[in-house]
Amino acid sequence: MIDVIMTGELLKTVTRAIVALVSEARIHFLEKGLHSRAVDPANVAMVIVDIPKDSFEVYNIDEEKTIGVDMDRIFDISKSISTKDLVELIVEDESTLKVKFGSVEYKVALIDPSAIRKEPRIPELELPAKIVMDAGEFKKAIAAADKISDQVIFRSDKEGFRIEAKGDVDSIVFHMTETELIEFNGGEARSMFSVDYLKEFCKVAGSGDLLTIHLGTNYPVRLVFELVGGRAKVEYILAPRIESE
Amino acid sequence: MIDVIMTGELLKTVTRAIVALVSEARIHFLEKGLHSRAVDPANVAMVIVDIPKDSFEVYNIDEEKTIGVDMDRIFDISKSISTKDLVELIVEDESTLKVKFGSVEYKVALIDPSAIRKEPRIPELELPAKIVMDAGEFKKAIAAADKISDQVIFRSDKEGFRIEAKGDVDSIVFHMTETELIEFNGGEARSMFSVDYLKEFCKVAGSGDLLTIHLGTNYPVRLVFELVGGRAKVEYILAPRIESE
Amino acid sequence: MIDVIMTGELLKTVTRAIVALVSEARIHFLEKGLHSRAVDPANVAMVIVDIPKDSFEVYNIDEEKTIGVDMDRIFDISKSISTKDLVELIVEDESTLKVKFGSVEYKVALIDPSAIRKEPRIPELELPAKIVMDAGEFKKAIAAADKISDQVIFRSDKEGFRIEAKGDVDSIVFHMTETELIEFNGGEARSMFSVDYLKEFCKVAGSGDLLTIHLGTNYPVRLVFELVGGRAKVEYILAPRIESE
């Protein structure tokens, strides 16, 4: 038996974060809170969502439980929910998830979790560079890069953090120095990534949200977003592209 | 000779209400105010519009008069009018309608009313259930139902008023009890309707508008919207769908 | 060497004004400020842009200089710039334009100005009627006319200034008298123009911007927009259409 209450904003954020990569997901209701993770069908990116128990208005579970959810349907219905609405999620038996908001009760059949693609192990990555910045600034940089190219280079060194994109006749560099960043360890790293994935990740975030980037060289990047005033943590791990230079 | 002045908001509302069902309509300028009604080409729905004389800023007619109007054209031009603009409608001869707003005078040829599809008789319906609610809430319920199915069931009984939609793997119930409704007689009734029509009807209304629903069992429903602060009454009568269960 | 700083709003306005007609343009950095002009490929319209030196935050040029710019690319990237951002344009050598805003540096290859279509001579036009009005009103009139026809007649006489459009069953007249206009010389003139061009021109302007119209009879019209609080002057010259009556 699961019975939790959260804000519409929180539900919309979690749902948006996951549908960026997959349409079905396993959601774990653990003692410490909600957890979910999944890799996209192309095996290029992973999403890891954590909502601590305290971020919910009410968090009642009689035991730790895993459900399989059609995220596309929840995402669709979440568009009818206002950010300030309170939303109640109820699972009374194995077969149905109830989503209650305002005068509406939405019921959707659960999916057998074992029928959903096996969950990824979270890789242990040693990433030398750590950059903490405003997610809104990052989003703007990716939007600008997207006008130039479908891939970007993230580069970190003593002089700061750079996002670079190169077109046939033009190029763009986003550059923040240590003093402009919220936190920066000056680590040396450089990898290339797909803009399409990054754009998709940015959709959950806005100005005021905190983004921590862990970067290596020709290595996956970890993008950790702290969302909804810190009440939700959404992490994306994205595989690098091979530079053909 | 007709010479009336109304707000842009009122004109836009009337026009929106009618184009939901037909592209040409007869408009009656009566002693008591403007009246129009029409059925859609599929004979599934009827719209009845009434704007009392007092809702106009100026209402001058030398005798009761009926004109035939290309509503699509008026709807199109009404998009150039702001809600707060004052709009003057003038008919000096049988052939032309003038719409004046700001520095603009728009003229459109009238249609011979006898060339427009015969107006429906308003049916006498005995509908046991009466529900009064905020039109904005209704609109949200229909928008949510639309994500699940193309038909909804309206159901009324002692426990309140319900709007239900059923998809293959999910379902939604909007439920308001007597205390949540503005007025409710607890009458027993249940009918199924097309979501597409209901969505179209809702476009005239918003939060704060009053909606009265008269419901029967496998019978047409009457949806009476009080719009523009009560200055316009728009009623839709919608035929039920047959449940194939 | 060019090094100038302007607001995002100003850059966006200049760029929007030029891409209305051409995708590549010569930009002159003169002692007195920025100047550019171009005719569209169909030879129907000309744009003339002038930004006085004082409209820039910083205006440093070591000598007068002409660059060839891919305006479509600048327009594209300008969508990533906020109106309130400060934007720095830098040309250090013949080959590259740098556009710096926030933490972003955008570089685009310059085009050899001699490879861009020869600039037009600005025609000397004797236009009897002069009309000064709010650009927002003009924009609304063109938007309304656009719903009726693809051409409009501009007409000026003692009774004021008119914009007229005629459809098959409807027509629209926008009419402002001398007292409603900001300035008006009552000159007699009448010409017909393409709505598509006028709509395109209006995109740079909004309510509060000043528009001066110089009109003749079956003659090109001059539309002079004062934009961004008077800091930019954008003039369009549009050839008339021949009336086939």
UniProtKB/Swiss-Prot annotation, chains A, B, C:
Subunit structure: Homotrimer. The subunits circularize to form a toroid; DNA passes through its center. Replication factor C (RFC) is required to load the toroid on the DNA.
DNA-binding recorded as keyword: yes
Single GO BP term: leading strand elongation
Name the record gives this protein: DNA polymerase sliding clamp
Statement: the UniProt record of this protein carries the keyword DNA-binding: yes
UniProt keywords, alphabetically: DNA replication, DNA-binding
A Pfam short name: PCNA_N
Family affiliation: Belongs to the PCNA family.
Protein purpose: Sliding clamp subunit that acts as a moving platform for DNA processing. Responsible for tethering the catalytic subunit of DNA polymerase and other proteins to DNA during high-speed replication.
Any one GO molecular function term: DNA polymerase processivity factor activity
CDD domains assigned: PCNA
HAMAP family linked to this entry: DNApol_clamp_arch (MF_00317)
